[in-house]
């Protein structure tokens, strides 16, 4: 369970000695020797931010942080976005979404099937998120893995005929794209209220986005939230998206 103490990082944290080690494979790095509960000064955060830009996924080993500390560190990256499923937000800390398959008194305490499909978090919003910060509390001995794919690399290695097919095109993204499908497979998805549906109205984004800091291009489609390619017949859109999805999750990505 997550602690609810009021401890927060100090206003002027001291520098910490830590190491950034790339993980095996095409994405990810682990940070060894950093204690997030002590707070992170600007110089140390600059290194973390650079690691995130370079490796896309950053793992902080052996952390013992409170919800307040997690929120405070998350805010270093930008304004936090509140998830639409308010039923599963942590009490008194709406910035944190509970992801759990635990049932208490016949009710799910969290979103139990998050990440069933490949997706980019909050791509269904007008302003997609920079990323998400996951804080593991209780894990199974095996299974339950979270997988990542490098969409920069997916674009870099996209065959030329597919590059031409998506050049300048946009795609629609919707939170409800596969919501009913997952809802009927398990008791994890509550029925959305009209207010919640209004918060996740369909949006349109370029199929290829350019990172504002690095200038690198990346594919921006996913089977979880992308519904169609604007301006293409339904069958052509479905076929092209299927090819993009398959390419995006090749082992080398």
What is each of the regions a protein language model found here?
Residues 3-253:
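Non-heme Fe(II) oxygenase catalytic core, chiefly the N-lobe of the double-stranded beta-helix
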